[in-house]
Amino acid sequence: MIQYVMNQTLQNSVIAQTVISDIKAGRPVIIVDSYDRENEGDIMLAAEMATTETLAFMAKHARGIMCIPCLAERLDRLAIPMMQSNKLDKFVTPFANSIDAAQDVSTGVSVSDRLNAIQKFVSESSVPSDFAQPGHLFPLRARSGLLQERQGHTESSVELCLLAEMKPIAIIIEVMNDDGSMARLPQLEELANKFKLNMISIDEIREYKYGKDSI
């Protein structure tokens, strides 16, 4: 039993390191809630590595809403408030006001328009007036304790950016099936195999960052 646990921990570490290498190289990865449940998954990319080609791939093959998870400090600095919510679930997705770039934008819907907004959001020189609200890119505020506080795709994507020694700003899109239903583990594995995307669970990220006792 001890040997099995050690082997599993080593395997999880290799998975995490492979995913981190992909993120550093600007390759998208898949984050899944859990391997032991047929849960949902997101395609994720470090925001500072976004290109029109990668965003177009994510939009085409994930099909969900394009979101930009970040820490609260980024939203505060850019004066982007949280959306008002009447949901009582403490784990509700933490949406801030949607944004577009204020300049050099057409409708805000195109990949190039959203890349423009992403690049301004990532830039350390950007100011609140660089953005129009509402828009077509959806910021998400990660909890300050990240995966130690909330085990969501928002926090896990920011954790992966930090592990890759990049800015704690990600791009995530939920994966949907052709018929509009949410993709579950079998469909996520099929997508990963088809496009050679590495996949990692939230628990694996948490274990790699904080140790097995954190799970």
Regions flagged by a language model, labelled:
Residues 2-215:
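Catalytic domains of riboflavin
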